[in-house]
């Protein structure tokens, strides 16, 4: 529906992603994508539309975090935190290479000014941590197996980051395989 309506310039945050994001990227709907990994399904080749956008330098801004850090960022968003201190990316290229420069970030109000900031650990003198920004989500889209007409949802299987983004977002769009009664879902 997003593709059909022609809406563009979305800022997308996602943990491990797949075909859903690949379609949006391929249709030019995503302005900036903050992610850790995107593949066609499971752990296969990188999504082809995403790969094309990156290799041919289409207008996709990309910021890369490690999988554990992006998942923690989404959880921190559900807790209402402004930033998250981590040690997980220390010494890696993810700490030193920014996909979206500070100059470009300042032109996009929905993006934080920096990818990260090395700050002193307030609990251990002489030690630093990496502070990463926590996203402020406008809308989350989650897929569930069952939902009631009142919005109660049931996820059967892995939840991944769906619960965190549903709590964090101002609005939630739920895609349900089946609409059931309140009695059945409770």
Regions found by a protein language model. Give the residues of each.
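Conserved alpha/beta enzyme-core scaffold
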Residues: 1-186
């Amino acid at each position: 529906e997003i593709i059909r309506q022609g809406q563009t310039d979305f800022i997308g945050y996602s943990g491990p992603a797949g075909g859903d994001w690949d379609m949006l990227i391929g249709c030019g709907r995503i302005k900036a994508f903050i992610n850790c990994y995107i593949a066609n399904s499971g752990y296969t080749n990188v999504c082809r539309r995403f790969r094309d956008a990156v290799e041919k330098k289409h207008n996709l801004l990309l910021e890369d975090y490690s999988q554990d850090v992006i998942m923690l960022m989404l959880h921190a968003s559900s807790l209402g935190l402004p930033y998250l201190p981590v040690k997980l990316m220390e010494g890696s290229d993810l700490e030193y290479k920014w996909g979206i420069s500070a100059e470009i970030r300042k032109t996009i109000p929905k993006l934080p000014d920096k990818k990260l900031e090395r700050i002193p650990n307030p609990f251990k003198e002489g030690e630093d941590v990496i502070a990463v920004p926590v996203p402020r989500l406008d809308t989350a889209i989650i897929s569930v197996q069952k939902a009631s007409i009142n919005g109660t949802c049931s996820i059967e299987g892995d939840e991944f980051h769906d619960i965190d983004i549903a709590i964090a977002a101002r609005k939630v769009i739920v895609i349900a395989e089946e609409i059931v009664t309140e009695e059945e879902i409770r």
